[in-house]
Amino acid sequence: MLLSDLSSDQEATGSNSHGGGGGDRMVVGSHGAAHVVLSNLFLPPAAAAAATMLLPAAPVMVRPAAMAAAQEPRAKKKRSLPGNPDPEAEVIALSPRALVATNRFVCEVCNKGFQRDQNLQLHRRGHNLPWKLRHRAAAVSAVTTAAPAPRKRVYVCPEPTCVHHDPARALGDLTGIKKHFSRKHGEKRWRCERCGKRYAVHSDWKAHVKNCGTREYRCDCGILFSRKDSLLTHRAFCDALAEESARLLAAANNSSSITTTTCNNSNISSNNNNNNINSISNSNNLLITSSSSSPPLFLPFSTTPAENPNPNQLLFLQQHQAAHHQLLLPQFQQPPSSPPAYFDHLAFGGGGGVITGSSCNDDNSSIAGDVMVAAGGDSVSFGLTSEGSVTMHAGDVGRRRLTRDFLGVDHDAGEVDELELDELPADLSTTAAACQGCNFAAATTAACCATDFTTGSRQYLGRLPPVNETWSHNF
């Protein structure tokens, strides 16, 4: 299709492909024929420049002032605060009985009550009874005469102690003053059956019952909340309480651990002395420990045996490496003192004794290190084998055993199996006599249950359990 055909069709119909009158340009050819050029691309360069100069200026769009004002952010109108009435308003004080009265206006036909007379008048129309609605005097006076507008009414609370009892803080709505008096000063007569919450205003109760139980917000402590903001407020206090409880518990645990270590270290310092103790040889009840350089022995008595009514205490020997020496307080690193009272109790009161030594002057001694021998009527006996390991024997055959199962590993009798006495080497009885001239001294390693001194590893012979952190933090 030629451009001339397109132009003739548009002239006949009066249409424009671009929808605007100024979109197409009329160009007159050399033969007088009019042509409509849809775009400057169809013209030669000289003609395109001339056509551009002939174009009218583009119209300038001007926004109306109303549209400009509509798009600008409008300042939100603030609601008047409750209790700040118009100074020109009429102040009305109703009695508490009038505020709490319900259904004051009753229909004489069906005995249905209404809170306002206007509602009763509208109800009377259904019974074909005469009814009359009260009109404001302003509506009547506006038609007849130019009377002034009526004053606005505000209501004060009848409770003298209430903040809204002051006319300057009166409420401007009759329904509002009624609900205020019921909520703040009235009886809460409506109770929720789900949560037990009570309300003084029936509409408040209905709104609560509608949503109660539909949404639950549970705290980690188990308390349920129906509102998220209540949960967030509670969680702030709950988390703070949990952190405080955890901090106090950690402090209590640290204090208990320090107290146990201090008590044990006090027993160590009391055992370090340079006095020799006479040995009481008892082949059935011996407590012997040995090491290359013997440490102070841990005898964790809660009280001394003289104060403890149970003379059959289970003695635990704990191991302290050189790395733990800084735990000893300066008060426990004092010059050695006299033997403690419970050594005398073991030696003379229970038919046994304790012998400790730092070095044996006797060349016949087979123990390379310090030796401690404890003997009693019922005690735990240790023995050093020829291979360099320590064995344990508890009590005599036929007597009550002292190796109680405090950790609960033996569910049958509550006690740990004993080692036979004949498993101990025969030269243990001579060890005590060989070490009578030994002195008390500090050491670096003590045996617990059974220790292999050649490899440095612990061996638990029989069914003796390892001591957990309740007894000592070193095991």
From Swiss-Prot:
Residues 1-16 have a biased composition (Polar residues). Residues 1-26 are annotated as: Disordered. The keyword Oxidoreductase does not apply. Transcription activator that acts as a flowering master switch in both long and short days, independently of the circadian clock. Promotes flowering upstream of HD1 by up-regulating FTL1, FTL4, FTL5, FTL6, EHD1, HD3A and RFT1. Seems to repress FTL11 expression. May recognize the consensus motif 5'-TTTGTCGTAAT-3' in target gene promoters. GO terms for molecular function: DNA-binding transcription factor activity; sequence-specific DNA binding; zinc ion binding. Gene3D superfamilies: Classic Zinc Finger. Zn(2+) 1 binds at residues 192, 195, 208, 212. Zn(2+) 2 binds at residues 219, 221, 234, 238. A zinc finger (C2H2-type) spans 105-127, 155-185, 190-213. A motif (Nuclear localization signal 1) lies at residues 123-130. Keywords: Activator, Metal-binding, Nucleus, Repeat, Transcription, Transcription regulation, Zinc, Zinc-finger. This is Protein EARLY HEADING DATE 2. GO terms for cellular component: nucleus. GO terms for biological process: long-day photoperiodism, flowering; positive regulation of DNA-templated transcription; regulation of DNA-templated transcription; regulation of timing of transition from vegetative to reproductive phase; short-day photoperiodism, flowering. It is found in: Nucleus. A zinc finger (CCHC-type) spans 217-240. Pfam families: C2CH-3rd_BIRD-IDD, C2CH-4th_BIRD-IDD, C2H2-2nd_BIRD-IDD, zf-met. Mostly expressed in developing leaves (more in sheaths than in blades, especially in the outer epidermal cell of immature leaves and in the region immediately beneath the meristem where internodes are visible) and panicles, and, at very low levels, around the shoot apex and in roots. Disruption phenotype: Never-flowering phenotype in the rid1 mutant. Extremely delayed flowering under both short- (SD) and long-day (LD) conditions, associated with reduced EHD1, HD3A and RFT1 levels, but increased leaves and nodes production. Levels of FTL1 and FTL4 are slightly reduced under both LD and SD, expression of FTL5 is down-regulated under LD, whereas FTL6 is down-regulated only under SD. In contrast, the accumulation of FTL11 is slightly higher under both SD and LD. Reduced levels of MADS1, MADS14 and MADS15, downstream genes of EHD1. PANTHER family: PROTEIN INDETERMINATE-DOMAIN 12, SERINE/THREONINE-PROTEIN KINASE RIO. It comes from Oryza sativa subsp. japonica. Changing residue 158 to L: In ghd10; delayed flowering time, tall stalks and increased panicle length and primary branch number, thus leading to increased grains yield. The keyword Nucleus applies. A motif (Nuclear localization signal 2) lies at residues 177-184. Transmembrane segments: none annotated. SMART domains: ZnF_C2H2. Residues 227-239 are annotated as: SHR-binding.
